[in-house]
């Protein structure tokens, strides 16, 4: 039993400067993985008025046209004319990637990783984590996708905002935008009321705020907000500054990895601090966070807990996690210690084991770079599958 509480989460559209950078970094990663699934990639992007900078380190046998990837990605997002303050065709693109020779990789790396899915247990054990760090995964049965309600709703709003812009329903909208929702939870920890909704959207200069308010309510709020969660006490804030014409990279600079809470659980669960986009699956910041979500989601889907948070930690060069911690916040059918042992038995959480378990050497990452990496029922992501849930039910 808990006290009533209000919890707030936010989302941003694909046209937000930080999210543009995430999408460019993951577009580069996907393009390299298409050519060479063994590519090692650490690709960071920065964006500002009229300029994109792509930097980092890659080890690959593939070759991709980075400039074209940048321009195509920016155009796809919707920055395709000068009056938006940023134009994919005319912006400057600086590439500062250190392209390392494929021969630099140690022979042992090549031998161990060449046939990832055929590796022996000894080979998996031999591949250590690429860095130290801790990663968290979370799941809750408060939504169909087993995500916290506030971030789930915030993403639905920004996705709908993008949809009505792209399909021409609201042609005066521009790509940048944000949502924020405040949800009231009752004593049982269930979401019961929508306390506040904030939505800011970039727009053409000649549209009135009255028109924007009317259209956002009709075309964004009505299709998305559950009627049973909204009443006369719900507060709505639409473009509360009164004007949002200057936006995107023309309004703010952006960087890869600046929206890690939007990418994950909206602040409802803890975060280890590592960003995802632009990193290949040998980086545990990304792969172990995906594995932690996979574990937590299967525990909740199996009925072993209503809520589950898992922490993994790694030491550089060591395969086995240095720690596994599970917290079910008093909702578990087994103790946290028992669940930890169950996880050790059923999930291979060594870096190479994660790559094999989730088949991560594929170009599947750009689609995750906006609107969240988790709870994406619209995408067939391996870490969102609940294929272990049936197996775990035997512990009920």
Curated annotation (Swiss-Prot):
**Binding partners and assembly:** Homotetramer; dimer of dimers.
Residues given in the record as ATP binding sites: 16, 176-178, 243-244, 252, 258-259, 275, 279
**Cofactor comment in the record?**
Binds 2 divalent ions per subunit.
Highest rank taxon of the organism: Bacteria
Name the chain's protein: S-adenosylmethionine synthase
Known catalytic reactions: L-methionine + ATP + H2O = S-adenosyl-L-methionine + phosphate + diphosphate
Keyword annotations for this protein, in alphabetical order, are:
ATP-binding, Cytoplasm, Magnesium, Metal-binding, Nucleotide-binding, One-carbon metabolism, Potassium, Transferase
InterPro entries per UniProt: ADOMET_SYNTHASE_CS (IPR022631), S-AdoMet_synt_C (IPR022630), S-AdoMet_synt_central (IPR022629), S-AdoMet_synt_N (IPR022628), S-AdoMet_synthetase (IPR002133), S-AdoMet_synthetase_sfam (IPR022636)
Q: Where in the cell is it found?
A: Cytoplasm
Biological role stated in the UniProt entry: Catalyzes the formation of S-adenosylmethionine (AdoMet) from methionine and ATP. The overall synthetic reaction is composed of two sequential steps, AdoMet formation and the subsequent tripolyphosphate hydrolysis which occurs prior to release of AdoMet from the enzyme.
- Top enzyme class, one word, equals transferase
Name what cofactor the protein needs. Mg(2+); K(+)
EC numbers listed for it are 2.5.1.6
Q: For the region Flexible loop, give the residue spans.
A: 100-110
Q: Name one Pfam family in it.
A: S-AdoMet_synt_C
Recorded GO molecular functions are: ATP binding; magnesium ion binding; methionine adenosyltransferase activity
Taxonomy of origin reads: Bacteria, Bacillati, Bacillota, Clostridia, Lachnospirales
Q: Which family does it belong to?
A: Belongs to the AdoMet synthase family.
Q: What organism is the protein native to?
A: Lachnoclostridium phytofermentans (strain ATCC 700394 / DSM 18823 / ISDg)
**NCBIfam families hit by this protein:** metK (TIGR01034)
């Amino acid at each position: 039993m808990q006290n009533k509480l209000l919890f707030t989460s936010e989302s941003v559209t694909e046209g937000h400067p930080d999210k543009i950078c995430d999408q460019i970094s993951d577009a580069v990663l996907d393009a390299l993985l298409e050519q060479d699934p063994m590519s090692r990639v650490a690709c960071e992007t920065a964006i500002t008025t009229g300029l994109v900078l792509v930097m980092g380190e890659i080890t690959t046998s593939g070759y991709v046209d980075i400039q074209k990837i940048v321009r195509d990605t920016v155009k796809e997002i919707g920055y395709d004319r000068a009056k938006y303050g940023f134009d994919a065709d005319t912006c400057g693109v600086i590439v500062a990637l250190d392209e390392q020779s494929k021969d630099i990789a140690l022979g042992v790396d090549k031998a161990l990783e060449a046939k990832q899915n055929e590796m022996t247990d000894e080979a998996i054990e031999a591949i250590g984590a690429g860095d130290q760090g801790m990663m968290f995964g979370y799941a809750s049965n408060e939504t169909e996708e087993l995500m916290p309600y506030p971030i789930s709703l915030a993403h639905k709003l920004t996705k709908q905002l993008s949809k009505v812009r792209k399909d021409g329903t609201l042609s005066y909208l521009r790509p940048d935008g944000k949502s924020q929702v405040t949800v009231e939870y009752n004593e049982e920890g269930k979401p019961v009321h929508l306390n506040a909704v904030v939505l800011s959207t970039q727009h053409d200069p000649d549209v009135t705020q009255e028109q924007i308010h009317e259209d956002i309510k009709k075309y964004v709020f009505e299709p998305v907000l559950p009627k049973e969660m909204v009443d006369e006490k719900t507060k709505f804030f639409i473009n509360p500054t009164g004007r949002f014409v200057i936006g995107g990279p023309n309004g703010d600079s952006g960087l890869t990895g600046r929206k890690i809470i939007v990418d994950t659980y909206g602040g409802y669960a803890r975060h280890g601090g590592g960003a995802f986009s632009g990193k290949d699956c040998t980086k545990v910041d990304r792969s172990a966070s995906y594995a932690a979500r996979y574990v937590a989601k299967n525990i909740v889907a199996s009925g072993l807990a209503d809520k589950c948070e898992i922490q993994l930690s790694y030491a550089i060069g060591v395969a086995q996690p240095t720690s596994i911690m599970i917290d079910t916040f008093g909702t578990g059918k087994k103790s946290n210690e028992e669940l930890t042992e169950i996880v050790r038995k059923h999930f291979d959480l060594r870096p190479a084991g994660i790559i094999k378990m989730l088949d991560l050497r594929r170009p599947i990452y750009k689609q995750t770079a906006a609107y969240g990496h988790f709870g994406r029922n619209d995408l067939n992501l391996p870490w969102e599958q609940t294929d272990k849930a049936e197996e775990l039910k035997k512990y009920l």
